[in-house]
């Protein structure tokens, strides 16, 4: 929404008649605001992408850990069965 407002303000300023078109501090600040918002938006999108990739990696690790845990529990049951046979 702030980006849309700043762009709309710039668009309205650019649509003025030739004698009303000025390059003043207000326009400079609007341009800076658009630039900052777009840079922040891009940085946030990169962070979201990185977070998603990390989440995918963590899910893979979790699945591997669950599989390892099942295997270890199965091995423990086998070892207990063998121990009871020896007694």
UniProtKB/Swiss-Prot annotation:
Detected in sperm flagella (at protein level). It holds the Pfam family Tektin. The keyword Phosphoprotein applies. Tyrosine phosphorylated. The keyword Transferase does not apply. Keywords: Cell projection, Cilium, Cilium biogenesis/degradation, Coiled coil, Cytoplasm, Cytoskeleton, Flagellum, Microtubule, Phosphoprotein, Ubl conjugation. InterPro entries: Tektin-like (IPR048256), Tektins (IPR000435). It is found in: Cytoplasm, Cytoskeleton, Cilium axoneme; Cytoplasm, Cytoskeleton, Flagellum axoneme; Cytoplasm, Cytoskeleton, Microtubule organizing center. GO terms for biological process: cilium assembly; flagellated sperm motility. One of its GO terms (cellular component) is axonemal microtubule. It comes from the Eukaryota. Residues 26-55 form a coiled coil. Microtubule inner protein component of sperm flagellar doublet microtubules. May interact with CCDC172. Belongs to the tektin family. Microtubule inner protein (MIP) part of the dynein-decorated doublet microtubules (DMTs) in cilia and flagellar axoneme. Plays a key role in the assembly or attachment of the inner dynein arm to microtubules in sperm flagella and tracheal cilia. Forms filamentous polymers in the walls of ciliary and flagellar microtubules. This is Tektin-2.
